[in-house]
Amino acid sequence: MFRRKLTALDYHNPSGFNCKDETEFRNFIVWLEDQKIRHYKIEDRGNLRNIHSSDWPKFFEKYLKDVNCPFKIQDRQEAIDWLLGLAVRLEYGDNAEKYKDLVPDNRKNTDNAAKNAEPLINLDVNNPDFKAGVMALANLLQIQRHDDYLVMLKAIRILVQERLTQDAVAKANQTKEGLPVALEKHILGFDTGDAVLNEAAQILRLLHIEELRELQTKINEAIVAVQAIIADPKTDHRLGKVGR
């Protein structure tokens, strides 16, 4: 119940603290006042430190009132939790300069993930070396030139991801197994007067249809790729500020 706050306060046994053990509980209160809260002056802590006194509960009840704790001595767990919260606040206040620059791990991970998700955001597009490198890659990969070098770079990245990765190359190198085609089911529409020529014409027509389908697929892919580039506010300054 108290482990996280005890850990934050560097308590020696945060996982094993037993508030129901009277001796351990009283020692804990003394430690909390001496090391973290420090509400009393050192010379005024004698009664609280005398944990074996039969009057200790009375002194502890007075202590709760002095620190303005809203809970009574009978509400032990609630009082402990409140005192721990007070100690944490005081600890942070004493060490504000130490903790102010700390960033939670989950926030660091989120920031890193955002940077990794869009690595083009922080590039200096006006750097001459950057422009020369992009132009060299575009020429090498035969990519159409564009006034915006960031647009060209994104086009290069898309091409590399889709065509030049290990998986893409392996897929392209796979031998495609053809399917048997019944030529008699495909009507030619004219007759050459020669059965062999008719069959050759049917084959040429089927090959032409296949080429047209592949061309249409490539055109569709190109349209999607271009739309992804020009519709991205990060690469099209007309659609918004860079990085937004």
From Swiss-Prot:
Record family assignment: Belongs to the RTRAF family.
Modified residues (N6-acetyllysine): K20, K62, K98
Name by which UniProt lists this protein: RNA transcription, translation and transport factor protein
Keyword annotations from UniProtKB, A to Z: Acetylation, Cytoplasm, Cytoskeleton, Nucleus, RNA-binding, Transcription, Transcription regulation
Subcellular location(s) per record: Nucleus; Cytoplasm, Cytosol; Cytoplasm, Perinuclear region; Cytoplasm, Cytoskeleton, Microtubule organizing center, Centrosome
Name of encoding gene: RTRAF
Superkingdom classification of source: Eukaryota
A molecular function (GO) term: RNA polymerase II complex binding
Predominant location category: nucleus
Subunit and partners: Homodimer. Interacts with FAM98A (via N- and C-terminus). Interacts with NIN; which may prevent phosphorylation of NIN. Interacts with POLR2A. Component of a tRNA-splicing ligase complex.
Signal peptide positions (record): none
